[in-house]
Amino acid sequence: MSIQVEHPAGGYKKLFETVEELSSPLTAHVTGRIPLWLTGSLLRCGPGLFEVGSEPFYHLFDGQALLHKFDFKEGHVTYHRRFIRTDAYVRAMTEKRIVITEFGTCAFPDPCKNIFSRFFSYFRGVEVTDNALVNVYPVGEDYYACTETNFITKINPETLETIKQVDLCNYVSVNGATAHPHIENDGTVYNIGNCFGKNFSIAYNIVKIPPLQADKEDPISKSEVVVQFPCSDRFKPSYVHSFGLTPNYIVFVETPVKINLLKFLSSWSLWGANYMDCFESNETMGVWLHIADKKRKKYLNNKYRTSSFNLFHHINTYEDNEFLIVDLCCWKGFEFVYNYLYLANLRENWEEVKKNARKAPQPEVRRYVLPLNIDKADTGKNLVTLPNTTATATLRSDETIWLEPEVLFSGPRQAFEFPQINYQKSGGKPYTYAYGLGLNHFVPDRLCKLNVKTKETWVWQEPDSYPSEPIFVSHPDALEEDDGVVLSVVVSPGAGQKPAYLLILNAKDLSEVARAEVEINIPVTFHGLFKKS
């Protein structure tokens, strides 16, 4: 996909530095020519505060949520950012310490409370973070920033002001929800979260939020659970970051990375555990893939199995005759990749960064093909009859269907991650192109385009430049799937460069169209969207 480059200067460390919010937008300096049709806002979420006073956050997913916005109008660009006023942030600023436990950082006990006060706080339940640093998405006419708990935060996409916290538990039965909901073209939102099912065992609920109706009531108040997936382990749900959706099916991939709920509930308050302390890997289960009939709201008991991998991001899922095509950004093995994303590791000098990454699960882009009709299938025979794929599915004597993938891209310690597609046109449908952030030993140093049919790749890469997830924006008069541009926030600490810029690439060949430079550093961002004017 690209020549593996070295980063001895360690410029990637700028991604993990605390910054201040802005009181008003900055005007960016544009080089090149921004298409006049590109009007709207790029909204992105990520951590912006990596310590509170003398207390540091330890994990990549701990820093307090910073909401970013690049506005595009008539060829000009402005940049703005504000910290999201979550409970976690407001209380930390008020008490000048970390008050709510984050993903990999324990909250320090309140020095004003004695041991009995802290003990009795255990019986009031676990205090879950609302630190909405992962993504932002629309619901009806509103926009919400989110993490992966039951809390989402309504924000104003124009001013970046925080409006209110919303607890999803008040509307549906979920303990949390992913930061990667699917949004259909009519505005319907689908998401997944674990829940307590029958006999107090764990299950996974698919939640549907309808589009805005004529009564203008908040669509979240009309949320409903439409189907439930079983869990392979009664008390240990798998970590779920995304799922697949087509017009007729829902796909859930259950990985061996598990949350030990007994540890979560018993040791959290008393022993100072954090979220990362409660993860463990099931070394023998492999991966279970589940499907449900979306229209009939029915779980289909096809038992798809394959070897172990970590999964964070689905690229796309679609139907092809009597098969489901599931394209995934995988990490080989059962060990949790997040174990390697502590800030101490990511801030190491380059040789240490590489050394740590060599121990981690290795990335691979894979295509799995799931046969839907297995009623009359022969045991031991490959059920995949589609041309142009090497993926296989074999029915075993225990009625499980063993899947072997087709590899779409693989490079040693070279990940194609944070995938994006022309979602409005191709989400849940056959497609050709995916865009991704290239990770070099976990350091983001290139932008990539992948033809999933031919495996041809294109790359944008510059020295001492660290881009973000690419966001595809379609041309308003597009005739082809890749007619449009790709947007990415690039941190550029190298000599002679501005600290950061918004990069605009031609989506066909990743050639540069324009860039909009700012005079301040921009820390790492995870996910976001383009909101058209």
Curated annotation (Swiss-Prot):
Main localisation: cytoplasm
Membrane topology: Lipid-anchor
Lipid sites, type S-palmitoyl cysteine: C112, C231, C329, C330
N-acetylserine modification, residue list: S2
GO process annotations (BP): retinal metabolic process; retinoid metabolic process; visual perception; zeaxanthin biosynthetic process
EC number: 3.1.1.64, 5.3.3.22
InterPro entries recorded: Carotenoid_Oase (IPR004294)
Outcome of substituting H180A: Loss of enzymatic activity
One GO CC term on file: plasma membrane
Residues that bear Phosphothreonine: T101, T105
Record's signal peptide: none
GO molecular function: all-trans-retinyl-ester hydrolase, 11-cis retinol forming activity; all-trans-retinyl-palmitate hydrolase, 11-cis retinol forming activity; beta-carotene 15,15'-dioxygenase activity; cardiolipin binding; isomerase activity; metal ion binding; phosphatidylcholine binding; phosphatidylserine binding
Tissues expressing the protein: Retinal pigment epithelium specific.
Highest taxon in the source lineage: Eukaryota
Known catalytic reactions: an all-trans-retinyl ester + H2O = 11-cis-retinol + a fatty acid + H(+); lutein = (3R,3'S)-zeaxanthin; all-trans-retinyl hexadecanoate + H2O = 11-cis-retinol + hexadecanoate + H(+)
Record's comment on post-translational modification: Palmitoylation by LRAT regulates ligand binding specificity; the palmitoylated form (membrane form) specifically binds all-trans-retinyl-palmitate, while the soluble unpalmitoylated form binds all-trans-retinol (vitamin A).
Keywords: Acetylation, Cell membrane, Cytoplasm, Endoplasmic reticulum, Hydrolase, Iron, Isomerase, Lipid metabolism, Lipoprotein, Membrane, Metal-binding, Microsome, Palmitate, Phosphoprotein, Sensory transduction, Vision
Subcellular location: Cytoplasm; Cell membrane; Microsome membrane
Residues binding Fe cation, per UniProt: H180, H241, H313, H527
Cofactor details (free text): Binds 1 Fe(2+) ion per subunit.
Assembly mode: Interacts with MYO7A; this mediates light-dependent intracellular transport of RPE65.
Function: Critical isomerohydrolase in the retinoid cycle involved in regeneration of 11-cis-retinal, the chromophore of rod and cone opsins. Catalyzes the cleavage and isomerization of all-trans-retinyl fatty acid esters to 11-cis-retinol which is further oxidized by 11-cis retinol dehydrogenase to 11-cis-retinal for use as visual chromophore. Essential for the production of 11-cis retinal for both rod and cone photoreceptors. Also capable of catalyzing the isomerization of lutein to meso-zeaxanthin an eye-specific carotenoid.
Family from the record: Belongs to the carotenoid oxygenase family.
The protein's name: Retinoid isomerohydrolase
